[in-house]
Amino acid sequence: MRMLLGSFAVYAAAALCEIGGCYAWWCWRRAGAGAWVLLPGMASLALFGWLLTLVDSDTAGRTFAAYGGIYIVGAIVWLRLVEGRPVTLRDAAGVAICLAGAAIILSAGRGAER
């Protein structure tokens, strides 16, 4: 259980970094922000990559697959809190399905392919 909670914390931090970094590019290209927003955006994306290496997993693919579910939750939270858009029933259903998938992958743990 401790590994799952630790992985979740790393995944949540990674999602914040990835979404924030990508949002900087979005703001520059689509919302008219100055190019200066790209510097913290790139730093955030670099931190995202480093954070994923902290997850206790034998394989990058399993780490990235489990992270995908957490990323989707983070993106929907971002939609609501940063962009001020409502979360729809379909958003919530999609999040639930993705979290179930991430939980299955995470619960397999190390050495699951044996």
UniProtKB/Swiss-Prot annotation:
It is found in: Cell inner membrane. Signal peptide: none annotated. Keywords: Cell inner membrane, Cell membrane, Membrane, Transmembrane, Transmembrane helix. Pfam families: UPF0060. GO terms for cellular component: plasma membrane. It comes from the Bacteria. It is a multi-pass membrane protein. InterPro entries: UPF0060. The chain crosses the membrane at residues 8-28, 35-55, 64-84, 92-112. NCBIfam families: PRK02237.1 (NF002586). Belongs to the UPF0060 family. This is UPF0060 membrane protein GDI3492/Gdia_2889.
